[in-house]
Curated annotation (Swiss-Prot):
Pfam families: Ribosomal_L28. Belongs to the bacterial ribosomal protein bL28 family. Keywords: Ribonucleoprotein, Ribosomal protein. One of its GO terms (biological process) is translation. It comes from the Bacteria. The gene is rpmB. This is Large ribosomal subunit protein bL28. The keyword Oxidoreductase does not apply. Gene3D superfamilies: Ribosomal protein L28/L24 (2.30.170.40). GO terms for cellular component: ribonucleoprotein complex; ribosome. InterPro entries: Ribosomal_bL28, Ribosomal_bL28/bL31-like_sf, Ribosomal_bL28_bact-type, Ribosomal_bL28_sf.
Length: 89
């Protein structure tokens, strides 16, 4: 199952999870030190939604991110779908 947004193209990113030790300088310590670094993935908030398209006069079932859902609220579904098709998502 793909974890990519159909409207914005957001997909999982790679990064690190840091293990930190020490007492912060604010608490009169010598500062926080990174003692370990583990690879991890950051996943977008993808959900399956049924949205009504006025142009096609039917429901569209899309896997979209929370950011795309806010875009749909702001611009309307048909405009966001047209933008996604032009960008190739």
């Amino acid at each position: 199952m793909s974890k990519k947004c159909a409207l914005t193209g957001r997909k999982p990113r790679r990064g690190y999870s840091y293990a930190i030790r020490g007492i912060s300088k604010k608490k009169k310590g010598i500062g926080l030190k990174v003692t370990g670094r583990t690879k991890r993935r950051f996943f977008p908030n993808i959900m399956t939604k049924r949205l009504w398209s006025t142009e096609e006069n039917r429901f569209l079932k899309l896997k979209i991110s929370a950011a795309a859902l806010r875009l749909v609220d702001k611009l309307g579904l048909d405009q966001v779908v047209a933008r996604a098709k032009s960008k190739g998502f």
